[in-house]
Structure formats: structure tokens, C-alpha cells
Regions:
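Hydrophobic h-region of N-terminal signal peptides that target proteins for export
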Residues: 9-17
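Sec-dependent signal peptide recognition
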Residues: 2-8
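N-terminal maturation segment of proteins
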Residues: 17-568
Length: 568
């Protein structure tokens, strides 16, 4: 570490004549430091030299980590951002904001003191990527698995020393994560090929890891559960102190939450107007007494759409259904040139492994390495009953594919990989990510499917009301105005969800703070930019030029993106 800092100082002192050179030197030093201290992230982004290790988590390691972050912030603050080019200034803002967020988490959230997922997620992700990424050659895969397995017992022992309080909710999540890690570890031998001595050593490490994990699980449930309790999420003060670090300093919590509630009513009314004709085909005109009657009409209509036999999809044909849907969406987007044809990612469909722990029906994997020609795995959650029905109907599969593949997340990833900046690729703006996915679905409907029947539009708007409702409950839940049970009830009712759908959103808000609020702001911001862009261009407006402007400079914060797009 001392060598890295010596390099930083020498480079910066030697480049005083150029603020831009100083920033470039500092950012490169930070990236090297980041991958060294985050070896699982290095593996995730395709940096091969850290495959065999995990992040160091002892008290002294955390202190060194915090001190390094503080030094990077000091060095970065000494670079005059006004002397940077507009493009480099964006990277400066991204890096500075991310460093401040890391510093806040380490100083205020301090997850290693109460959240077992701090170490369990590191273990799971580190092994899962090595197990599933196809581009890792076998020698590196074996060496990486071997090194990481050896580290697990010590990591769990260190975690025991550092946890001083508990959150019952996170112990529950931790138990599920441990079960998933054990399942993953049991499958590792069939993923590896090496000499017998090495494989025997790995087998012994697997036995030791499973024993350590089961011991850790017992300790969580019997010992940690009796330590002082953390009142999650209230004790974390997410609704006020954390908000600017996760959302951005330009957004005010009160203003955001006020807009959320206003938007909820508007979207629900839109859904109702589309639902009523369908409802009246099988029902008498309802007698409206209160808002609940309006919601009941919508709920009945959504259930009616999902239960129609012609809309349902057999699990046995799910892969072909997804392929047909994606091909159809690609033809739609290309027929009007909505996105550049030569910037896209190859996508391979696969059933997710049983040990992949995700509440979502689909998930992208292996899209992080900055290689435009690499392939993305699109995991579909499998089900034991191969003759049964897939949980999503055909309309919902189209919506999901528009969001994640084309013209959604996969297209955004491809453009981000083409842009040269490593800082903005390493730390993409989460509000931009979420906003583009929602906009991608809206764009398909507005540009191509506007004359489709109301059922599609109802389900599209249901996706938006899910975002809005999740944003609302995060404001209430994080501030202690609503407990988890009441938040679940609210989101089920207001967003027309079943139990599993509501639980999936709650888990997101539990483990990935402000997921709903980020998506809501992203949805509002990108539509605001589109409206202003259309106004500026008038008759010269072209949707493909707008999309190109949004995508071509990487996944950057909206305050910077807006300047770039509207200056064109």
C-alpha cells in the first residue's frame, strides 16, 4: 500500500502543470488500489490477478481502508475541477461522489458490526463468479477457487470478532445466504478440472468450509441473536443522513416523496381508465365509495389478464418463448432505427443454477468485464414442475425483455463498454441505470406498440406503479413511520402485487438501499430530459438521435447528462 501512495505522490507532484494529468494519475492509482482491496470486484470486472483472495475484513484492515479513502478524497479535492475538460470533470464528480459514499458507509453504517451479509455476500459472489464465468480458463478457475476456499474459515472467524450487535432481519437473510453458499460449494467439484492432488486438496477445503459455515450459522442463531439489537432500518438514519450519498445532493427528500405520492395517484387513475372497459365485460358497474373501489377494479383486471389461458406460458417452452420475444423486440427497435445496430451485446439464455439466490424471475450475469464482444448470460429462474406454468405471462415476458435486453439494460451496457473512461464504467450511476430501463419499455410502447390493446399498457403501467410504490414505502420504512409488515401490505395493495412480488421488492429495499427511489427519480429525470429535448428540436426531433445522446457517453449522473443532451 505504501508503494501505491508513493506512486500517487510522485505522479501528482510531477504533473502540477496540468490538473487533468494530475486527475488521470490519481484516478489510475485509485483503480489499482480499488481492485487490490476489492478482489471479488476485480474478478467481476475481469481483472485476473486477484481471483484467489477476498477482501480483508479485520479491524486493522478496515482502519487502513478508511484512512486510504480519506487520503484519496484529500488528493482529489486539491485538483481544481474548473481546470478540467468537461468530460474529465464528469469523471471527477463521479469519483468524488463515490469516495464520499464509501467513507459514509465505513464511518456511519459500519455493516461489519451488525450485518452478517457483509462477509457472506463477499464469499458467495467470489465463488459464484469463478464457478459460472465461462471466459475464465481452467487453471485460473482452479487456483482462484482453491485460494478463496482456504480463506473462508478465517474470514468467518474474523467476522465473529467484529459483530457486536444484531438485526433479526439480516440474520434471516444470512441464514438463506449460508444455505446458498453450501449448495454452491457442493457443486464446485464438477466445475473444476485439475490433477488429483489439487482436487483432493479442494475437497478437503470444501469440507472445512462447510463446517465453518454451519458453525457460523449456529453462532448467528444462538449467540448473535442475544447481542444488543439494531433497530433496522431506523437506527441507520437512511431517510435523512444517507439520502444525499445514495441519491445525490441535488435532490431533497421531502420534495421527492411529495412527487412520489402525486405520481402514484396519476398512474393509478390511468390504469383504471384502461381497466374499466375490461372489467365491465364481466361485471356490473361498481358503486364507488372510496379509493379502494378504484383499486379493486384494477386488481380484478390484472388478475383477469394474467389468468387468460392464451396469455400463459408453459415452463417446458419458456426458453423458446424468451428467444422469440427477444427476436421480436430486436426487429421492432431496428425497423425504426431506435438504437444503433452495431452496438449491442450477444445474449445467451440459460436457466439459473439452483444455488443462485435471487427473487427475480430473470437476471443478467457476466456483463461487467469491459469487453464489447463478450457474451451476457441471461438467467431465467427454473422451476421444479416442468409441466407447470411460468409465473410470468407472455405480455410480462415482453416487458421484462424490453427492460433487460433490448432496448434496455443490455444496450446500455454495450454503449458504456465502448466509452473509454474506466471510472464511469466502474461506478455507473444507479439512477441512470434504472431510468433507462423504465424508459426503454416506455419507448417500445410509444414508438412501436402504441396501438396495441389495453392489456399490454395496463401491465406496463403496473411496472411503473411498482416503482412508485416502492419509492413511497422506502421513505416511510426508512424513517420509521411504517414497519416492514405494513410496508408489505401497502405495496401489495397500491401496486397490485402478490405476496412473492411484494417480498421481492421489500428485500431489495432491505439490502440495496433506495432501490425504489433511485428508479423513480431515474424515470422522472429521463422523461423530463426527453420533453425538453423535443421542445428544443421541434420538427427536427428524432428519437434515435435522442437515444444516441443518452447512451454514448457512458452511464453518468443526470445533472451532467442533461447538460450534454440539451446542448446538442
Amino acid at each position: 500500500m505504501k508503494n501505491i501512495w508513493l506512486t500517487v505522490i510522485i505522479l501528482i507532484v510531477g504533473c502540477q502543470s496540468s490538473a487533468e494529468s494530475s486527475f488521470n494519475s490519481l484516478s489510475q492509482a485509485f483503480i489499482s488500489w480499488y481492485y487490490k482491496f476489492h478482489p471479488v470486484e476485480a474478478t467481476r470486472f475481469g481483472i485476473g490477478k486477484h481471483h484467489d483472495s477476498f477482501r480483508l475484513i479485520s479491524t486493522s484492515d478496515n482502519e487502513e481502508y478508511i484512512a486510504d479513502i480519506s487520503r484519496f478524497i484529500i488528493e482529489l479535492s486539491q485538483i481544481d475541477a474548473t481546470k478540467l475538460s468537461p468530460e474529465v470533470r464528469i469523471d471527477h464528480q463521479i469519483l468524488y461522489s463515490h469516495l464520499e459514499k464509501i467513507q459514509y458507509v465505513m464511518n456511519d453504517i459500519r455493516p461489519w458490526e451488525w450485518n452478517p451479509l457483509w462477509v457472506l455476500d463477499e464469499i458467495y459472489d467470489g465463488l459464484f463468479i469463478l464457478s459460472e464465468r465461462r471466459e475464465i480458463n481452467m487453471d485460473d478457475r482452479v487456483a482462484g477457487v482453491q485460494g478463496r476456499l482456504k480463506s473462508i474459515p478465517e474470514m468467518l472467524s474474523r467476522s465473529k470478532e467484529m459483530i457486536i450487535s444484531h438485526s433479526s432481519l439480516h440474520i434471516e437473510h444470512g441464514n438463506r445466504r449460508i444455505d446458498g453458499i453450501i449448495h454452491l460449494i457442493n457443486q464446485l467439484p464438477i466445475k473444476l478440472n485439475s490433477d488429483n492432488l489439487t482436487l483432493d486438496e479442494i475437497d478437503r477445503s470444501i469440507i472445512a468450509c462447510k463446517e465453518s459455515l454451519l458453525n457460523y450459522q449456529k453462532w448467528l442463531n444462538q449467540t448473535v441473536a442475544h447481542k444488543p439489537g439494531v433497530q433496522f432500518p431506523l437506527n441507520l438514519k437512511l431517510s435523512d443522513q444517507a439520502f444525499p450519498y445514495y441519491i445525490g445532493k441535488k435532490y431533497l427528500p421531502y420534495s421527492v416523496y411529495k412527487l412520489v405520492d402525486k405520481k402514484r395517484i396519476s398512474v393509478q387513475n390511468h390504469i383504471f381508465n384502461l381497466s374499466l372497459p375490461i372489467y365491465l365485460t364481466d361485471n356490473d358497474e361498481p358503486v364507488w365509495l372510496d379509493r379502494d373501489d378504484t383499486l379493486e377494479v384494477i386488481h380484478w383486471t390484472i388478475d383477469h389478464i394474467r389468468n387468460k389461458p392464451e396469455n400463459q406460458v408453459l415452463i417446458s417452452s419458456i426458453l423458446s418463448n424468451f428467444y422469440e420475444s427477444i427476436s421480436y423486440l430486436q426487429k421492432l427497435t431496428h425497423s425504426k432505427g431506435l438504437i444503433p445496430k452495431n452496438i449491442n451485446k450477444r445474449t445467451k439464455l440459460s436457466f439459473s443454477p439452483a444455488y443462485m439466490q435471487s427473487g427475480s424471475h430473470v437476471q443478467l450475469f457476466d456483463h461487467h468485464p469491459k469487453e464489447l464482444n463478450s457474451e451476457i448470460l441471461y438467467y431465467i429462474r427454473g422451476h421444479d414442475d416442468s409441466e407447470g406454468l411460468f409465473p410470468l405471462i407472455s405480455y410480462e415476458i415482453d416487458l421484462m425483455n424490453a427492460r433487460y435486453i433490448v432496448p434496455g439494460r443490455s444496450v446500455q451496457i454495450a454503449h458504456a463498454q465502448k466509452y473509454p473512461s474506466h471510472i464511469r464504467y466502474l461506478f455507473p450511476d444507479p439512477i441512470n441505470i434504472a431510468g433507462w430501463q423504465i424508459y426503454a419499455v416506455q419507448m417500445i410502447f410509444n414508438e412501436e406498440l402504441n396501438d396495441w390493446d389495453n392489456e399490454y399498457h395496463i401491465l406496463r403501467l403496473k411496472e411503473e406503479i411498482m416503482v412508485i410504490s416502492q419509492a413511497y414505502i422506502e421513505g416511510q420504512y426508512y424513517s420509521g413511520k411504517m414497519d416492514r409488515k405494513n410496508a408489505m401490505s401497502y405495496i401489495k395493495k397500491q401496486a397490485f402485487l402478490n405476496d412473492s412480488e411484494a417480498e421481492e421488492l421489500m428485500v431489495q429495499s432491505d439490502l440495496h438501499y433506495f432501490t425504489g427511489i433511485q428508479a423513480f427519480i431515474g424515470m422522472m429525470e429521463i422523461n423530463s430530459i426527453l420533453t425538453e429535448y423535443k421542445k428544443n428540436k421541434g420538427d427536427k426531433f428524432q428519437i434515435n438521435q435522442f437515444n444516441k445522446a443518452i447512451l454514448e457517453n457512458g452511464i453518468i449522473p443526470f445533472n451532467q447528462l442533461k447538460k450534454q443532451v440539451l446542448s446538442m
